[in-house]
Amino acid sequence: MHELSIAHNIVNIASAAAAEAGTEEISAVYLRIGALAGVVADALRFSFAIAAEGTPLANAELIIEEVPVTVFCPTCNTEVTLPNPRLFRCPHCGRPCGQIIHGRELELVALETP
């Protein structure tokens, strides 16, 4: 379960940012996680609650934006969002697509203070 190590890294980064900003508490952490990032959102939420205990993030809400897979279709010459991220075929023309534009993200976007 690598979500626990990810949660610890989020807590470390956010705690350092809180200390640098001179705040003692973080109320929310905003993340963007791509469908291909290999992260289970519920497992990350559970792990985050454990990792945040005793830190400025102890009462913080973890807000996750799930990013769908977007690829470039060379046949249609456009970016398309895949309805099924396991099939890398353009939903318009059915041809294979290989260039991933979005969907691998794992980004800490913002921190919110009370």
UniProtKB/Swiss-Prot annotation:
One Gene Ontology term of the biological-process aspect is: protein modification process
Task: Spell out the InterPro entries in the cross-references.
Answer: Hydgase_Ni_incorp_HypA/HybF_CS (IPR020538), HypA/HybF (IPR000688)
Q: Which Pfam families match?
A: HypA
**Which residues of the sequence carry a binding annotation for Zn(2+)?**
73, 76, 90, 93
Query: What are the entry keywords?
Result: Metal-binding, Nickel, Zinc
Residues at which Ni(2+) binds: 2
Kindly list the GO molecular function terms attached to this UniProt entry. Answer: nickel cation binding; zinc ion binding
Q: Which family does it belong to?
A: Belongs to the HypA/HybF family.
Q: What does this protein do?
A: Involved in the maturation of [NiFe] hydrogenases. Required for nickel insertion into the metal center of the hydrogenase.
Which HAMAP family does the UniProt record give?
HypA_HybF
PANTHER family cross-referenced by the UniProt entry:
HYDROGENASE MATURATION FACTOR HYPA
Q: What is this protein called?
A: Hydrogenase maturation factor HypA
Organism name: Chloroflexus aggregans (strain MD-66 / DSM 9485)
Taxonomic placement: Bacteria, Bacillati, Chloroflexota, Chloroflexia, Chloroflexales
Gene name as annotated: hypA
